[in-house]
């Protein structure tokens, strides 16, 4: 039986120790539900096995600070300002971006082949900020140690976890080293929503063209293409679309386009 602990509001030392070790894999609460967190190739392999998931989607990199995001992902000033706005307002946001060449080389230099599981065929990943305190604490601390944290929702592929730890399923629970519980925290983020109406995931915005290249700066121009594309709706979609409109004259909405 996998050990369960309650998140106490501060950094989970047990979770940190597991992720710092080799092949560690935990379940952690976020603003929208539970995720599987890991920090190396062995852990990523366990994540895919636990979820029985295909491997064509971009991996999710959890950024514990804006400095980490800037160190890893290619950004332009408009995209960086867009992220900063969501950071300052504590809004969950994930964008599909290419890696900085030097950061990708560092990823490959780990020598375990994790880059194959972290990127899609175009070499992009989804870089996520403000995903929830428990995970942010772990990601920030591990980044201080030079380690990145990778994630996937902790539910059988194609099914939601309903924001409750019992929704992660036996297969995932049995495949990880630790489950950090915080059902109350998850519920507190969407207090006016029911199980049926709550968002199960965060918003995802593609900031790359069809070949995975970073979209150009718009600089106030109109009818720019390629432009940002909202490819997944989710928590705070209304605020994020407002920020898109404030930052970019052109952006698109294509629910599910990537997947």
What residue ranges belong to the model's regions?
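Active-site-adjacent structural elements in enzyme catalytic cores
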Residues: 1-259
